[in-house]
Amino acid sequence: DLLNRLTIKNLKLNKKRSIVTTIGILLSVALITAVATMVTSFRESLIEYEKKSNGNYEYVFYDVPESEISFLKNNRSIKDLYLVSGLGYAKIESQNEAKPYAYVVSMDKNAMENLGLNLVEGKVPTNESEIVIPTSVKTNGRLDYKVGDYITLDIGQRQSEGYNLNQNNPYDIDTKEEIINTKTKTYKIVGIVKRMDLEPYTAPGYTFITYSENGSKLNDVYVYLTNKGLKN
């Protein structure tokens, strides 16, 4: 009580200074609150941008056999998962010598919605006979495919001297390589998308994306964890 009385007495004796001090405190609190709000808002904006650009997932498991996907689906720490399967390479008439292929990838609906598939034109594939292509096919490969066109691809495994090659193996003009075990498939181009983050800049194939509900023999599985899973 004594301290309170002394404080009130001092405030009354120094009204002007007290008013200035009070205003200063209010302004400081307002400034701190504004800065905290800006930081939080900026952080949320960065998170949303990253989700939209590169995908809304936390972990990825590569080359998961089809028979093991059910174990991931039933894992209580996993809130959601998305399936991506590399179907193979097909030779196209690209004008970029370092990128002579289409690399055909299938995605399930969840993957298309959560892995940064940004449409420029058209729509996403809804069946296994539809496909979307990246803008870089035209800007980099000088191929003028349009939405509504049909494209026939001989899709197979890229190989050199008996070794299987993937998107992390750049195309070497001086090295002999071939596409083996090809299967011919005709697709309707239903959309054009921005280049996806899952395609390395040095990749030899432009990523063409088709639809698949259940994946294939080997899948890259992108997972989004529960809060409990994140803590563990």
Task: Label the predicted regions.
Residues 1-33:
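N-terminal Sec/SRP start-transfer signal
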Residues 40-232:
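Basic-flanked hydrophobic alpha-helices used for secretion and membrane insertion
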Residues 33, 37-41:
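Transmembrane alpha-helix boundary/anchor motif
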